[in-house]
Amino acid sequence: MKIIVILGINADIGSNLGNLFINDGYKVIGTYRKKKPTNIPKADIYKCDITKKKDIEKFVSTLKKKKIKWDIIFSSVGTSEPISKFFDTNFDIWRKSVNVNFISQLEVIHFLYKLRSGNKNSIILLAGGGTNNPFTNYSAYCVSKIALIKMCELIDDEYKNLNTFIIGPGFTKTKTHLETIKAGKKAGKNYLRVKKFLKSSNQGTSFKKIYECILWGIKESRKVTGGRNFSVVHDKWGTNRLKINLLNDTGKYKLRRFKN
Protein backbone atom coordinates (compact mmCIF):
# COMPACT_ATOMS: atom_id res chain seq x y z
CA MET A 1 0.00 0.00 0.00
CA LYS A 2 1.42 3.38 -1.02
CA ILE A 3 1.55 6.13 1.57
CA ILE A 4 0.83 9.81 0.98
CA VAL A 5 1.49 12.55 3.53
CA ILE A 6 -0.87 15.51 3.13
CA LEU A 7 0.25 18.69 4.88
CA GLY A 8 -2.80 20.77 5.80
CA ILE A 9 -5.33 17.99 5.40
CA ASN A 10 -7.89 20.20 7.16
CA ALA A 11 -7.98 22.46 4.08
CA ASP A 12 -10.74 21.83 1.56
CA ILE A 13 -8.36 20.66 -1.15
CA GLY A 14 -6.39 18.56 1.33
CA SER A 15 -9.38 16.72 2.79
CA ASN A 16 -11.13 16.12 -0.53
CA LEU A 17 -7.98 14.81 -2.18
CA GLY A 18 -7.29 12.72 0.90
CA ASN A 19 -10.60 10.90 0.50
CA LEU A 20 -9.93 10.36 -3.20
CA PHE A 21 -6.54 8.82 -2.42
CA ILE A 22 -8.12 6.59 0.24
CA ASN A 23 -10.77 5.42 -2.21
CA ASP A 24 -7.97 4.41 -4.57
CA GLY A 25 -6.27 2.30 -1.91
CA TYR A 26 -3.66 4.70 -0.53
CA LYS A 27 -2.80 5.06 3.14
CA VAL A 28 -3.27 8.74 3.96
CA ILE A 29 -1.40 10.56 6.72
CA GLY A 30 -2.33 14.17 7.34
CA THR A 31 -1.48 17.17 9.48
CA TYR A 32 -3.65 19.98 10.79
CA ARG A 33 -2.92 23.11 12.83
CA LYS A 34 -6.07 24.06 14.76
CA LYS A 35 -9.24 22.06 14.16
CA LYS A 36 -9.02 18.34 13.38
CA PRO A 37 -11.07 17.52 10.28
CA THR A 38 -13.94 15.08 10.71
CA ASN A 39 -14.72 14.50 7.02
CA ILE A 40 -11.82 12.13 6.38
CA PRO A 41 -12.22 9.41 9.05
CA LYS A 42 -10.00 6.78 7.40
CA ALA A 43 -6.88 8.96 7.45
CA ASP A 44 -4.24 8.98 10.19
CA ILE A 45 -4.25 12.61 11.28
CA TYR A 46 -1.77 14.43 13.51
CA LYS A 47 -1.81 17.89 15.04
CA CYS A 48 1.20 19.76 13.69
CA ASP A 49 1.69 23.49 13.34
CA ILE A 50 4.31 23.52 10.59
CA THR A 51 5.50 26.98 11.66
CA LYS A 52 6.76 25.42 14.91
CA LYS A 53 9.90 23.31 14.72
CA LYS A 54 8.95 21.33 17.85
CA ASP A 55 5.68 20.26 16.21
CA ILE A 56 7.51 19.17 13.07
CA GLU A 57 10.07 17.19 15.06
CA LYS A 58 7.32 15.49 17.06
CA PHE A 59 5.37 14.59 13.91
CA VAL A 60 8.42 13.19 12.11
CA SER A 61 9.51 11.31 15.24
CA THR A 62 6.08 9.66 15.47
CA LEU A 63 6.26 8.50 11.85
CA LYS A 64 9.78 7.21 12.43
CA LYS A 65 8.72 5.21 15.50
CA LYS A 66 5.87 3.68 13.51
CA LYS A 67 8.34 2.87 10.72
CA ILE A 68 6.26 4.79 8.19
CA LYS A 69 7.91 5.50 4.84
CA TRP A 70 6.16 7.88 2.46
CA ASP A 71 5.74 7.57 -1.30
CA ILE A 72 4.10 10.95 -1.92
CA ILE A 73 3.99 14.31 -0.15
CA PHE A 74 1.28 16.80 -1.04
CA SER A 75 1.03 20.21 0.61
CA SER A 76 -2.33 21.93 0.89
CA VAL A 77 -1.08 24.50 3.40
CA GLY A 78 -1.65 28.15 2.63
CA THR A 79 -3.17 31.52 3.44
CA SER A 80 -3.89 34.50 1.19
CA GLU A 81 -3.52 36.98 4.06
CA PRO A 82 -2.47 39.72 4.59
CA ILE A 83 -4.56 41.20 1.81
CA SER A 84 -3.69 44.83 1.16
CA LYS A 85 -1.22 47.00 -0.71
CA PHE A 86 2.31 46.07 0.34
CA PHE A 87 3.19 49.25 2.25
CA ASP A 88 -0.18 49.20 4.00
CA THR A 89 0.38 45.75 5.50
CA ASN A 90 1.74 44.92 8.93
CA PHE A 91 5.15 43.54 7.98
CA ASP A 92 5.21 41.04 10.84
CA ILE A 93 2.01 39.51 9.47
CA TRP A 94 3.45 39.68 5.94
CA ARG A 95 6.55 37.81 7.09
CA LYS A 96 4.44 35.15 8.84
CA SER A 97 2.47 34.63 5.64
CA VAL A 98 5.64 33.97 3.64
CA ASN A 99 6.70 31.57 6.37
CA VAL A 100 3.43 29.62 6.15
CA ASN A 101 3.15 29.70 2.37
CA PHE A 102 6.79 28.92 1.62
CA ILE A 103 9.48 28.35 4.26
CA SER A 104 7.57 26.16 6.73
CA GLN A 105 6.35 23.82 4.00
CA LEU A 106 9.93 23.27 2.88
CA GLU A 107 11.07 22.70 6.46
CA VAL A 108 8.61 19.82 6.92
CA ILE A 109 9.63 18.31 3.59
CA HIS A 110 13.30 18.70 4.57
CA PHE A 111 12.64 16.72 7.76
CA LEU A 112 10.59 14.09 5.93
CA TYR A 113 13.15 13.48 3.17
CA LYS A 114 14.94 10.73 5.09
CA LEU A 115 11.65 8.88 5.63
CA ARG A 116 10.95 8.35 1.92
CA SER A 117 10.09 4.81 0.85
CA GLY A 118 12.60 4.32 -1.95
CA ASN A 119 14.08 5.79 -5.09
CA LYS A 120 10.85 6.89 -6.78
CA ASN A 121 9.02 9.38 -4.62
CA SER A 122 6.88 12.39 -5.54
CA ILE A 123 6.42 15.81 -3.97
CA ILE A 124 3.52 17.96 -5.16
CA LEU A 125 2.95 21.58 -4.16
CA LEU A 126 0.23 24.12 -4.95
CA ALA A 127 0.82 27.23 -7.05
CA GLY A 128 -1.62 30.12 -7.11
CA GLY A 129 -2.54 33.55 -8.41
CA GLY A 130 0.12 35.86 -9.76
CA THR A 131 2.11 33.34 -11.76
CA ASN A 132 1.43 35.16 -15.03
CA ASN A 133 0.43 38.65 -13.85
CA PRO A 134 0.45 40.90 -10.78
CA PHE A 135 -1.85 39.61 -8.08
CA THR A 136 -2.66 43.04 -6.69
CA ASN A 137 -2.89 43.29 -2.87
CA TYR A 138 -1.78 39.67 -2.32
CA SER A 139 2.00 40.18 -2.35
CA ALA A 140 2.97 37.76 0.46
CA TYR A 141 0.87 34.97 -1.01
CA CYS A 142 2.00 35.66 -4.56
CA VAL A 143 5.74 35.89 -3.89
CA SER A 144 5.57 32.68 -1.84
CA LYS A 145 3.92 30.78 -4.69
CA ILE A 146 6.54 32.02 -7.15
CA ALA A 147 9.25 30.88 -4.73
CA LEU A 148 7.64 27.43 -4.47
CA ILE A 149 7.64 27.14 -8.26
CA LYS A 150 11.37 27.83 -8.38
CA MET A 151 12.06 25.54 -5.44
CA CYS A 152 10.40 22.66 -7.30
CA GLU A 153 12.85 23.19 -10.15
CA LEU A 154 15.82 23.38 -7.77
CA ILE A 155 14.88 20.18 -5.92
CA ASP A 156 14.26 18.42 -9.22
CA ASP A 157 17.69 19.48 -10.48
CA GLU A 158 19.50 18.36 -7.32
CA TYR A 159 17.63 15.12 -6.55
CA LYS A 160 17.04 12.72 -9.41
CA ASN A 161 15.26 10.31 -7.04
CA LEU A 162 12.36 12.73 -6.58
CA ASN A 163 9.59 13.76 -8.94
CA THR A 164 8.85 17.26 -7.66
CA PHE A 165 6.27 19.41 -9.40
CA ILE A 166 3.68 22.07 -8.67
CA ILE A 167 0.12 22.59 -9.89
CA GLY A 168 -2.15 25.61 -10.09
CA PRO A 169 -5.70 24.39 -9.32
CA GLY A 170 -7.47 27.45 -10.66
CA PHE A 171 -10.61 28.95 -9.10
CA THR A 172 -11.93 26.36 -6.64
CA LYS A 173 -14.61 26.86 -3.99
CA THR A 174 -12.64 26.67 -0.75
CA LYS A 175 -12.65 28.42 2.62
CA THR A 176 -9.56 30.39 1.58
CA HIS A 177 -11.82 32.75 -0.39
CA LEU A 178 -13.40 33.87 2.88
CA GLU A 179 -10.14 35.71 3.62
CA THR A 180 -10.82 37.88 0.57
CA ILE A 181 -14.40 38.54 1.68
CA LYS A 182 -13.09 39.49 5.12
CA ALA A 183 -10.59 41.91 3.56
CA GLY A 184 -13.34 43.73 1.67
CA LYS A 185 -12.09 46.79 -0.23
CA LYS A 186 -8.50 45.95 0.64
CA ALA A 187 -8.74 43.07 -1.83
CA GLY A 188 -9.33 45.51 -4.68
CA LYS A 189 -11.05 44.16 -7.80
CA ASN A 190 -10.66 40.60 -6.56
CA TYR A 191 -13.23 41.21 -3.82
CA LEU A 192 -16.16 41.50 -6.24
CA ARG A 193 -14.76 38.68 -8.37
CA VAL A 194 -14.63 36.31 -5.40
CA LYS A 195 -17.98 37.48 -4.00
CA LYS A 196 -19.66 36.79 -7.35
CA PHE A 197 -17.99 33.38 -7.60
CA LEU A 198 -19.05 32.28 -4.11
CA LYS A 199 -22.66 33.31 -4.73
CA SER A 200 -22.84 31.53 -8.08
CA SER A 201 -23.64 27.88 -8.76
CA ASN A 202 -20.26 27.55 -10.46
CA GLN A 203 -18.08 25.21 -8.38
CA GLY A 204 -14.91 26.11 -10.24
CA THR A 205 -12.24 23.45 -10.66
CA SER A 206 -13.43 20.15 -9.24
CA PHE A 207 -11.36 18.32 -6.64
CA LYS A 208 -11.58 15.27 -8.89
CA LYS A 209 -9.86 17.13 -11.72
CA ILE A 210 -7.10 18.35 -9.39
CA TYR A 211 -6.65 14.77 -8.22
CA GLU A 212 -6.47 13.43 -11.76
CA CYS A 213 -3.82 16.00 -12.67
CA ILE A 214 -1.71 14.94 -9.70
CA LEU A 215 -2.02 11.25 -10.59
CA TRP A 216 -1.00 12.04 -14.16
CA GLY A 217 2.06 13.94 -12.92
CA ILE A 218 3.13 11.05 -10.71
CA LYS A 219 2.59 8.43 -13.41
CA GLU A 220 4.54 10.32 -16.07
CA SER A 221 7.68 10.48 -13.88
CA ARG A 222 10.15 13.31 -13.43
CA LYS A 223 11.40 13.40 -17.03
CA VAL A 224 8.01 14.75 -18.03
CA THR A 225 6.77 16.60 -14.94
CA GLY A 226 9.77 17.12 -12.67
CA GLY A 227 10.49 20.75 -11.75
CA ARG A 228 7.54 22.09 -13.72
CA ASN A 229 4.44 24.17 -12.99
CA PHE A 230 1.15 22.93 -14.44
CA SER A 231 -2.24 24.60 -14.70
CA VAL A 232 -5.00 22.11 -13.96
CA VAL A 233 -7.45 24.19 -15.98
CA HIS A 234 -5.46 25.52 -18.94
CA ASP A 235 -2.71 23.00 -19.72
CA LYS A 236 -3.30 19.94 -21.91
CA TRP A 237 -1.90 17.51 -19.37
CA GLY A 238 -2.68 13.90 -20.13
CA THR A 239 -2.09 14.35 -23.86
CA ASN A 240 0.71 12.69 -25.78
CA ARG A 241 1.43 15.95 -27.61
CA LEU A 242 2.27 17.79 -24.40
CA LYS A 243 4.34 14.86 -23.17
CA ILE A 244 6.50 14.99 -26.30
CA ASN A 245 6.88 18.78 -26.02
CA LEU A 246 8.00 18.49 -22.40
CA LEU A 247 10.52 15.77 -23.18
CA ASN A 248 11.98 17.93 -25.96
CA ASP A 249 12.12 21.19 -23.99
CA THR A 250 13.56 21.04 -20.47
CA GLY A 251 12.74 24.73 -19.92
CA LYS A 252 9.03 24.43 -20.65
CA TYR A 253 6.59 25.22 -17.81
CA LYS A 254 9.37 26.65 -15.63
CA LEU A 255 10.25 30.19 -14.54
CA ARG A 256 12.20 31.56 -17.50
CA ARG A 257 13.11 34.94 -19.00
CA PHE A 258 14.58 33.11 -22.02
CA LYS A 259 12.29 33.08 -25.11
CA ASN A 260 9.95 35.51 -23.34
Each language-model region and where it sits:
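Structural signature of the Rossmann-like NAD(P)-dependent dehydrogenase/reductase core
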Residues: 6-7, 75-78, 121-128, 163-168, ...
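N-terminal Rossmann NAD(P)H-binding glycine-rich loop of SDR-like oxidoreductase domains
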Residues: 10, 14, 18
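Rossmann-fold cofactor-recognition segment
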Residues: 41-54
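Conserved mid-core segment of classical short-chain dehydrogenase/reductases
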Residues: 57, 78-95, 137
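A short, exposed helix-loop element centered on a Lys and neighboring polar residues
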Residues: 109-110, 153
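Catalytic loop of short-chain dehydrogenase/reductase
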Residues: 122-160, 168-174, 178-184
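C-terminal helical subdomain
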Residues: 166, 186-259
